[in-house]
Amino acid sequence: MPLSRGELLKQILTRYLSELQKVINRGDAREESFYHCVKEMLESYAQANGFRRSEVSILPKATEAGNPDFRVWDGKTRITGYIEAKKPEVSQLESISESEQLKRYRDTFDNLILTNFYEFWLFQYGKFVCGVTIADPLEAIHSQKKPPLTNIEDFDTLLDRYFSFSLPAITDPKSLANALAKRTRFLRDEIITIELAEEEKTQGRKVLLKFYESFKKLLINNLTIEQFADLYAQTLTYGIFVARTRSGEDFNRELIYKYIPNTLGILKSIFRFISLEEPPQALAVLIDDIADILFNTDIQKILHRFYTEGKGRDPIVHFYETFLSEYDPKLREKRGVYYTPEPVVRYIVRSIHSLLKSHFGKDDGLASEDVTILDPAAGTLTFPAEAIKVAIEEHEGKYGSGSVHKLIKHHILPHFHAIELMMAPYTVGHLKISYLLAEHGYELSEAERFKLYLSNTLEPDTPQQTELPIAHDISEECALANKV
């Protein structure tokens, strides 16, 4: 006769407590000594209760860069949740749950268990859900005997809630901006900054440090490590966002590289490292998490909502604004990252369009094929995007919509130029123009790109090639910018 659910769980937990006791009785146990016990217990529970493909991964701590100790997968490439463990003698989980470390984890990871291997606290969306003690850890430590098993049914309820968790589909811009911002903040402060500090001290691979040196040597020679951590974290998040707008139904870290356009060489190189090579484990974990968030997001619906909620006609830049306000409002204010009001942009661009007609003999204004434009400090391409809209509007008004494809291919793509120094707005700008052109029925081919280049217009010399990562791509971008 098969065991009931409760009897089976009792069997699993009895074996689990026995394994914990063996570790304790050896007398030399560290926190990591107990990891295999909880991994086996959770996987046994999952197998017995309808979560057959679930897998518990122990996250290595090669550096101080901080993710929780375990990650749980649903067996279908999606993340179920995370687990942070403390030694059994740490009996005050309530005080631990209010520590700075746990606050960061609770803010970043939506389904989290805190445990000392005997007591388990479940947090979802940062809020305490329930806590269950299955045995007394102090009795196990002091008596050297396995303590009595308790609260089996309550523990079953806790684990069932944990394993049943799945991220809801995100359909509104504010929720997505918040979900991405808190993870990007964690990526910047708890992963990239710490990994860079570790790489400076050790003789290891120093991959992130070499990326930093590339940007400092070839683009921004006063770039600090803190600024690079911010630049790199934002670039990763927006790069994943770009890839998601181009992806099919499936989406994960390994697929990001596939969906970055070949013409964006710098971004492509960054994600070759992330998707196809061996990034630091802590970094890979966070990228998996961000990819999981975007997998559960209807990107096109969110971008469309910016049009319908009175946000104006530029959904990409408004998403950028919303993200920055969630990510780091002080940084946004310090850098002056505020978009020029759209009525002002329209007035300036349409005034230029009118002057081209009235004073320079260009009958089609910005749509005239011998007109070239350049924005040397383009930001997120607010002005070039408006110029494109005006040119298409002029062309459609005179010649109909049938030849707009030709206008884009033979005038806008070769004659509209922009240069930007910072990687995040550069990435957002490319996304914006791709979206704008698609709205007019033009999909960029793999060989095409809008002529927005990453370069320093105040130091226009093409940087010398070096062996540093992405040096070739940065040098190529700067050379193309210099030709303009």
Report the location of each language-model feature.
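Non-catalytic substrate-recognition/targeting regions of SAM-dependent transferases
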Residues: 267-333
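Surface-exposed beta-strand-to-loop junctions
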Residues: 12-19, 329, 408-412
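Charged, often flexible domain-edge or linker segments that flank or initiate folded functional domains
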Residues: 68-69, 73-289, 335-338, 344-480
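Active-site metal-binding core of divalent-cation-utilizing nuclease and nuclease-like domains
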Residues: 50-77
